[in-house]
Amino acid sequence: MELSFSSKDLEFRDEVRDFLANEYPKHVKEKLDNGEPLSKEDIVDWHKSLSAKGWMGFNWPVEYGGTGWSPAQIYIFQNELGLAGCPPLIPFGVSMVGPVIYSFGNQEQKDRFLPDILNFDTWWCQGYSEPGSGSDLASLKTKAEPVSENGKDYYIINGSKTWTTLAQHADWIFCLVRTDSSGKKQEGISFLLIDMNSPGIEVKPIITIDGDHEVNSVFFTDVKVPAENLIGEEGKGWTYAKFLLAHERFGIAGVGASKRQLERLKEISKDLGDE
């Protein structure tokens, strides 16, 4: 079995390295090299540099604006970014909800949401875990009740989510909600897209043991969400959630970054005289 990269793959690797040498935002690199935290604006600048190159949809098919890269090219891309010490890509749009939308959403939803994900004009967060519903995710209780007003259909959302990463920056949240409690717990879950600026949403920080603010609690009190923001069929959210998790694990593997940190540990070990 031939496991080495092809000449085409090596050319692509060189293209990625050239991009990082010339188009990786210098102020972002300098901050990371100096151990300084990145602002929201820094993170957006980094992602927009990838968007300008046409690489934001690195794992998307061409028909939806992606690169259509091979698995080898995707590996090379992620590996080179990690080895160069680039900020991790925010996965919630491009690696999580984006594939759900282009796989299960209707055409109007694809037209509305996918371009903003590719341009990083919309920052997404993930509304899965709840207090008491983490590993047993299907036990979630955040409720969505259907209502009609002036000829339009909505869901009224009440409940909360927790450990919501970077919700303090997010414009939208993709959210698992309970639309039916009569059957098996997996059967009554639906997948909604919710504007984080909707009245009734409150984000509270969770400060972790290292003093960092990365995760949050998100509270929903009578939040009105247009029914057109439902992905796929009502009650099929568990299927879409599992599909998303497969993309999530792939998107956050961090192989290149792990290699870089391993090399750093080797250097530290040598400096300490540990052979």
For each feature predicted by the language model, list its residue ranges.
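Glycine-rich beta->alpha junctions and the first turn(s) of the following alpha-helix
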Residues: 201-275
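Glycine-rich phosphate/pyrophosphate-binding beta-alpha loops
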Residues: 132-134, 162-167, 209-210
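A short core secondary-structure module
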Residues: 141, 153-204
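A short, Trp-centered hydrophobic/proline-enriched beta-strand micro-motif
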Residues: 120-128, 176
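Internal helix-loop-helix
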Residues: 44, 51-111, 115-121, 166-172
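A structural signal for short hydrophobic beta-strand segments in well-ordered beta-sheet cores
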Residues: 142-146
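Intrinsic disorder at enzyme termini
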Residues: 1-11
